[in-house]
């Protein structure tokens, strides 16, 4: 009752898959699934790298803005 723990469950599932798709179609489906997973992992990795680089850029811009604003305030106070 705990799901697919028996070997017979897996045998029946595999038999149904072979009957539905045919023996020739299964390698093509597996190849497509594998390339989809590969592309997904690559996209996740690219997003993580982009996220690592993005805060540094924002912090640098914020620091430059603060320095520029504080120098303007000092120049106004001195005049």
UniProtKB/Swiss-Prot annotation:
Region spans: Disordered: 48-79
Where is the sequence biased in composition, kind Basic and acidic residues? Answer: 66-79
**Which Gene3D superfamilies does the record cross-reference, listed alphabetically?**
1.20.5.3310
Q: Name one GO biological process term.
A: protein transport by the Tat complex
Picking any one GO molecular function of the record gives: protein transmembrane transporter activity
InterPro entries per the UniProt record, alphabetical: TatA/B/E, TatA/E
Which Gene Ontology CC terms are recorded? Answer: TAT protein transport complex
> Which PANTHER family does the record match to this protein?
SEC-INDEPENDENT PROTEIN TRANSLOCASE PROTEIN TATA
Q: What is this protein called?
A: Sec-independent protein translocase protein TatA
UniProt source species: Helicobacter pylori (strain ATCC 700392 / 26695)
Which lineage ranks, top first, belong to the organism behind this chain? Bacteria, Pseudomonadati, Campylobacterota, Epsilonproteobacteria, Campylobacterales
The coding gene here is: tatA
